[in-house]
Amino acid sequence: MNVIEGKMTQDGIKVGIVVARFNEFITSKLLGGAKDGLVRHDVPEENIDVAWVPGAFEIPLIAKKMAKSRKYDAIICLGAVIRGATSHYDYVCNEVSKGIASVSLESEIPVMFGVVTTENIEQAIERAGTKAGNKGYDCALGAIEMINLVRQIG
């Protein structure tokens, strides 16, 4: 049996990050975690491009534009959607997750889902660097692993 695994090494990779400005007190921490994860694994800062969008709903379009440019080996999508009193939360979560998934499948470029979807602000804070780790950092490691896995498969 031949096992193919993505390694936590990189060789000249370039990563695009799309981050939502809405709930910026959370998303800026996710972005910090993503950049930290990439730099700690030897991705030079000049190989990391960051695009800010108004909110999570706008993430898939810019992720798709980045993917179509073919400049990036992976794209990391970061946002924070926190449930409120209306059904808006459900619509945004559904469309953002579908949109991000479609970008990855259509482009065949790893697109990491770092949009935290939580019931309350406390859960979002936990996922942005406290009790539950930092989902941005997790996405950075996942991006490096997926880049190497995709390269191995060809």
Curated annotation (Swiss-Prot):
Gene Ontology molecular function, alphabetical: 6,7-dimethyl-8-ribityllumazine synthase activity
Top-level EC class as recorded in UniProt: transferase
Record protein name field: 6,7-dimethyl-8-ribityllumazine synthase
Active site residues per record: 88
EC number: 2.5.1.78
Pathway assigned to this chain's UniProt record: Cofactor biosynthesis; riboflavin biosynthesis; riboflavin from 2-hydroxy-3-oxobutyl phosphate and 5-amino-6-(D-ribitylamino)uracil: step 1/2
Family annotation (SUPFAM superfamilies): Lumazine synthase (SSF52121)
Entry function: Catalyzes the formation of 6,7-dimethyl-8-ribityllumazine by condensation of 5-amino-6-(D-ribitylamino)uracil with 3,4-dihydroxy-2-butanone 4-phosphate. This is the penultimate step in the biosynthesis of riboflavin.
TM ranges: none
Gene: ribH
Family: Belongs to the DMRL synthase family.
This protein's record includes keyword Transferase: yes
Entry binding sites for (2S)-2-hydroxy-3-oxobutyl phosphate: 85-86, 127
BP terms from Gene Ontology: riboflavin biosynthetic process
Residues at which 5-amino-6-(D-ribitylamino)uracil binds: 22, 56-58, 80-82, 113
Catalytic reaction list: (2S)-2-hydroxy-3-oxobutyl phosphate + 5-amino-6-(D-ribitylamino)uracil = 6,7-dimethyl-8-(1-D-ribityl)lumazine + phosphate + 2 H2O + H(+)
UniProtKB keywords: Riboflavin biosynthesis, Transferase
Pfam family, one: DMRL_synthase
GO CC annotation terms, alphabetical: cytosol; riboflavin synthase complex
